[in-house]
C-alpha cells in the first residue's frame, strides 16, 4: 500500500523528497530516501528479498536504487549488503573508511569514502554525514536536503552530538532513535555488560533522552506558523521497549516542558519489520 503522508506542496513548491522505513529496530534496519530522480538506501540490515519487497510496497523498484549509504558496520545495518551488491553490480556504496574496513570483504560494489562534516551530492540530494557516539568504527548519521526540505536520520548513538542537534533543528522530518526504556532495560535478562554498553555514551538513546532532545529541538526550531516538524521514532528494542511505552514517555517529557504532540510536532513510531507509510518531507 502506497500512502503519502504530510504535505506535497510547501509554499508553492512541489516537494519531491520522501522517506520510507523498510525495517527499523535492533534486528535490522533499512530506509528509503528518494526524489523523483534519485533513489537511495540507508543501511541494508535485512535480506535482499525483504529490501526488494519493501521497496515494491513503497512504489520503488530495486533496480532504480543508485546508492547505498551505510551508517556503521554492525550486523543489523549491513546484513544484506553482500546479496544486495551482487544483485545490483552498479550500486555505489558510501561509508566512512572505518566502516569500510569491516564490510569490504562482503561488498562487491564500488566504494566511495565519506567523512563526517563533508557534504556530497547524489543526483539532486545533498547528503550530510555527521558524527555519532556509538561503539563502532567511525559511525555516522545522515541528513538529506533537496529543494530546501531536510530529512535527518539519527539512530545508534549514546547521546546527540552538538553537530547532530544543529541538523535536527533545521529538519522538516526527523527519524530519531528511541531504543529502550531505562527501567525495563535494567530489569531485563541481558548480561550486565550489555546493559552497561546500551546505557553508555556509546550505546543507544533511551525514550527519556529522546524526549528531552525533542524539547531542545522545538526550543530552537525555525519552522513557520503553518508547519510543524514530524518525528518518526526509530530503532526500538524488541526486548526493552514497545511503541506505546516510547510514545507515552516522550509525550510526558514534552508536556512537562509545554510541548504537545499534534500541536507542536507530529509523531509516529516505525515498525521493526513492517514497511512504513511514505512520508513527504
Name each model-derived stretch:
Residues 41-45, 65-73, 94-97, 152-156, ...:
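Active-site neighborhood of phospho(di)ester-bond hydrolases with catalytic His/Asp-centered motifs
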Residues 48-95:
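Active-site metal-binding motif and surrounding structural segment of the metallo-beta-lactamase
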Residues 95-149:
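Metallo-beta-lactamase
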Amino acid at each position: 500500500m502506497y500512502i503519502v503522508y504530510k504535505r506535497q506542496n510547501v509554499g508553492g513548491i512541489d516537494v519531491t523528497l520522501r522517506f520510507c522505513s523498510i525495517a527499523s529496530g535492533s534486528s535490522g534496519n533499512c530506509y528509503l530516501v528518494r526524489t523523483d530522480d534519485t533513489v537511495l538506501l540507508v543501511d541494508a540490515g535485512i535480506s535482499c528479498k525483504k529490501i526488494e519487497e519493501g521497496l515494491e510496497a513503497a512504489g520503488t523498484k530495486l533496480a532504480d536504487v543508485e546508492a547505498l549509504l551505510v551508517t556503521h558496520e554492525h550486523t543489523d545495518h549491513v546484513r544484506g549488503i553482500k546479496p544486495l551488491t551482487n544483485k545490483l553490480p552498479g550500486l555505489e556504496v558510501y561509508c566512512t573508511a572505518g566502516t569500510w574496513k569491516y564490510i569490504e570483504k562482503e561488498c562487491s560494489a564500488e566504494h566511495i569514502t565519506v567523512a563526517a562534516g563533508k557534504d556530497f551530492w547524489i543526483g539532486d540530494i545533498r547528503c550530510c554525514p555527521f558524527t555519532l557516539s556509538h561503539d563502532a568504527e567511525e559511525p555516522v548519521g545522515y541528513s538529506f536536503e533537496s529543494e530546501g526540505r531536510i530529512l535527518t536520520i539519527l539512530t545508534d548513538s549514546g547521546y546527540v552530538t552538538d553537530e547532530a542537534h544543529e541538523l535536527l533543528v533545521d529538519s522538516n522530518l526527523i527519524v530519531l532513535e528511541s531504543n529502550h526504556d531505562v527501567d525495563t532495560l535494567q530489569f531485563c535478562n541481558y548480561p550486565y555488560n550489555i546493559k552497561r554498553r546500551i546505557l553508555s555514551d556509546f550505546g543507544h538513546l533511551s525514550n527519556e533522552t529522546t524526549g528531552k532532545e525533542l524539547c531542545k529541538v522545538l526550543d530552537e526550531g525555525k519552522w513557520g506558523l503553518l508547519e510543524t516538524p514530524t518525528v518518526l521514532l526509530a530503532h526500538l528494542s524488541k526486548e526493552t521497549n514497545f511503541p506505546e511505552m516510547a510514545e507515552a514517555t516522550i509525550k510526558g517529557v514534552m508536556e512537562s516542558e509545554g510541548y504537545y504532540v499534534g500541536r507542536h510536532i507530529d509523531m509516529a513510531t516505525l515498525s521493526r519489520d513492517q514497511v512504513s507509510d511514505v512520508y513527504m518531507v
